Amino acid sequence: RKDSIAITYKYLDSIRSIPFDSTINDFDKYFSVPSSYLYLGNNGAAAYSLIYAPNAKPGWDAGFHTFDIYRYTLEESKFYKTNRPFSQLSYQLASGKEQMIKVLHTQSPRTNFSFGFDYRLISAPVFFITQNTNHKNYRLFSNYQGKRKRYAAFFILVGNTIKASQNGGITADSLLQDPNRKQRFTVPVNLGNKNAYQPNPFQSGVITGNINKDLTVFVRQTYDIGKKDS
């Protein structure tokens, strides 16, 4: 039976319409850490690419790229076009009470206007003291095209809150063999030992670690003054 919904999307600097793919192809992309990256073991932890890729963006760079793979960016923003409202909800649960929630909603009330939002929560209390991560990302997007297809407007609002605790590693490897420390959060670490800790998926605070926040608002307006193709 033919699908009743037709949905395509475009990237910000592209004119190519891409059909929305809901199959299991590239299923590994549902995990927030790409297969070419090395990370510290829990979802949301610091990571770096095993494939060399220089930063070619012009301008000053602060050098903080440890958590880049967990951020929403302008470049990856999509503008959808659909004949019906479309929503997608994803929930993933892993060991150590790791969880990831993703929400997407988009709709096109008119053929020349569409809007939607993305949201993602990554929460990983993990096993050791002061190792938890809690990342929140959201994105609002909208685009409009005039009836004569000359005027166009694009709007994107992207926000990221990155929280990642740091414990400096355990004090000694031999403690992992201690039968009295089967609960790994009882193993002492180099930073944050005094923190009362219980693995809790709803724990979002960071006492010792990194908290990075950024907000980007993007508006683009264009007008085509070219002659219509004959």
Language-model region placement:
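Solvent-exposed N-terminal domain segments of exported/luminal and surface proteins
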Residues: R1-Y52
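Outer-membrane beta-barrel translocator/channel fold
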Residues: S35-S36, W60, P125-N137, F141-K213
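Short strand-turn segments of transmembrane beta-barrel domains in outer membranes
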Residues: W60-A62, T73-F79, N83-L104, V126-F127
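Outer-membrane beta-barrel channels and translocator barrels
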Residues: T82, R110, G146-K149, G226-K228
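Residues that define the transmembrane beta-barrel architecture of outer-membrane proteins
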Residues: N83, K97-I101, N134-Y138, K213-V217
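Transmembrane beta-strands of outer-membrane beta-barrel proteins
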Residues: S87, F115, Y151-F155, S230
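Transmembrane beta-barrel strands of outer-membrane/channel proteins
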Residues: L89-L93, Y119-L121, F155-G159
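Residues on the lipid-exposed face of transmembrane beta-strands in outer-membrane beta-barrel proteins
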Residues: V103-Q107, F117, L140-Y144, V219-I225
